[in-house]
Amino acid sequence: MPYVLISTQIRMETGPTIVGDEFSDLVLMAQLEADKRTVLGNNFSEYYVNEPPRVTLNKLERLGYRVVSMTGVGQTLVWCLHKE
């Protein structure tokens, strides 16, 4: 999958970072050492890493991903990355 979205809460800029959902590439999630979690009350799962977004962005760059866009939505920061 060539696109990846990662996000974090502004008050949590030191982590954790959300790096995927239940349909994400399992190989990539393993490379990021992400844990799959389901928050009580949600009917979906997300993959998290316990590190700041900067560290995760650096890992993704080493894997060939590049940031396409970044935005803030309320208290959430979101990055979209693409791999050629």
Swiss-Prot record:
Assembly information from the UniProt record: Homopentamer. Forms a complex with GCH1 where a GCH1 homodecamer is sandwiched by two GFRP homopentamers.
SUPFAM superfamilies in the record: GTP cyclohydrolase I feedback regulatory protein, GFRP (SSF69761)
The family this protein is said to belong to: Belongs to the GFRP family.
Leader peptide range in chain numbering: none
Keyword terms: Cytoplasm, Membrane, Nucleus
Taxonomic placement: Eukaryota, Metazoa, Chordata, Craniata, Vertebrata
Name of the protein in its database record: GTP cyclohydrolase 1 feedback regulatory protein
InterPro entries: GFRP_sf, GTP_CycHdrlase_I_reg
Main location: nucleus
A GO biological-process term: negative regulation of biosynthetic process
Compartments reported by the entry: Nucleus; Nucleus membrane; Cytoplasm, Cytosol
Gene that produces this protein: gchfr
GO terms assigned for molecular function: GTP cyclohydrolase binding
Pfam families: GFRP
GO cellular component entries: cytoplasm; cytosol; nuclear membrane; nucleus
Function: Mediates tetrahydrobiopterin inhibition of GTP cyclohydrolase 1.
